[in-house]
């Protein structure tokens, strides 16, 4: 999980989701997991 100021999808399987006011990227590739900090 990477904590970033700007979150963007890396590949076509990345999905942007809003959880508890935070933007999260979930993907089949675990390296692409991101959260806005």
From Swiss-Prot:
Family of this protein:
Belongs to the bacterial ribosomal protein bL36 family.
What this protein is reported to do is described as: Component of the chloroplast ribosome (chloro-ribosome), a dedicated translation machinery responsible for the synthesis of chloroplast genome-encoded proteins, including proteins of the transcription and translation machinery and components of the photosynthetic apparatus.
SUPFAM superfamilies named among the record's database cross-references: Ribosomal protein L36
GO term, biological process aspect, one: translation
The record's subcellular location field reads:
Plastid, Chloroplast
| Key words, A-Z | Chloroplast, Plastid, Ribonucleoprotein, Ribosomal protein
Where does it mainly reside? plastid
Q: What is this protein called?
A: Large ribosomal subunit protein bL36c
Q: Transmembrane: present as a keyword of the record?
A: no
What does the subunit comment say?
Answer: Component of the chloroplast large ribosomal subunit (LSU). Mature 70S chloroplast ribosomes of higher plants consist of a small (30S) and a large (50S) subunit. The 30S small subunit contains 1 molecule of ribosomal RNA (16S rRNA) and 24 different proteins. The 50S large subunit contains 3 rRNA molecules (23S, 5S and 4.5S rRNA) and 33 different proteins.
